[in-house]
């Protein structure tokens, strides 16, 4: 049976207040072969702290920081390191 890996890309800029809910929705999926790449697009809020909590809970969460470059730039940075056969964008 084919069980492809899904790469979920979550670009974040000043969305810390929504990040936990978005990442919890990923964790609650019934399909388990995924990685979730949280891309902090230079947020001055506490996005990094929240993301690091999730990374420490589950190795399928990956954190990436980059200088602010906008939504497309953040998505592309996540896609560049994605290992999945399919890409799923998810906005926090």
Give short role names for the model-derived ranges.
Residues 87:
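Short aromatic/hydrophobic "clamp" motif used to bind/position activated sugar donors
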Residues 67, 90-92:
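Catalytic metal- and UDP-sugar-binding loop of GT-A-like glycosyltransferases, i.e.
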Residues 14, 43, 70:
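Alpha/beta-hydrolase active-site loop signature
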